[in-house]
Amino acid sequence: MAKLSVSDSPERRTGFGRANARERSINQRKLRVLLAEKMHLIAADLAFELEQEGLEVTAISHTLAETMQLIAHKPIDLALMNVEFSDGKSYPAARRLKDAGIPFAFFTTFTQDEIAEDFRTAPCLRKPQDTHRIAAAVKDLARRARRDPEIP
């Protein structure tokens, strides 16, 4: 699975102390979730469910371009992304997340085999899916992020 961390702190820019600073930060607050979903109604429903599970949806995007901007400028701890947007597939965003060290999962109609080879080990939640089950899976990813900020 790919990882993402977005921060302007010196620890994040240099890599020094990144795990310890991130672990302290994550354990002291709600996890900030980026939700990247092209369908507005699905995104709103899923955001509601994630917040009911105690996560903070700090950003919602509906295109690849918006997703890339949010990754670059918004602090997030994990992401849930559709694979396909109107302006392209989410793989450039997945690459940024992976390189930055923040966990993510795909939420898509794609099968694991249809996902680009570089990202086949990332968690893949298949659509259609009950939003309660999706929220529970993201909460599990969040628990893993809290325990180990360097999870693959």
What are the residue ranges of the model-derived segments?
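Non-catalytic signal-transmission and effector/linker regions of two-component phosphorelay proteins
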Residues: 1-32, 130-152
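Conserved acidic segment of CheY-like receiver
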Residues: 30-41, 46
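Short hydrophobic helical patches associated with two-component signaling proteins
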Residues: 45-50, 134
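Alpha-helical interaction/dimerization surfaces of two-component signaling modules
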Residues: 48-53, 70, 96
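Acidic, metal-coordinating helix/loop segments flanking the phosphotransfer/catalytic sites
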Residues: 60-78
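Conserved phosphotransfer microenvironments
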Residues: 81-98
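Alpha4 helix (beta4-alpha4-beta5 surface) of REC/receiver domains from two-component response regulators
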Residues: 92, 99, 110-127, 132, ...
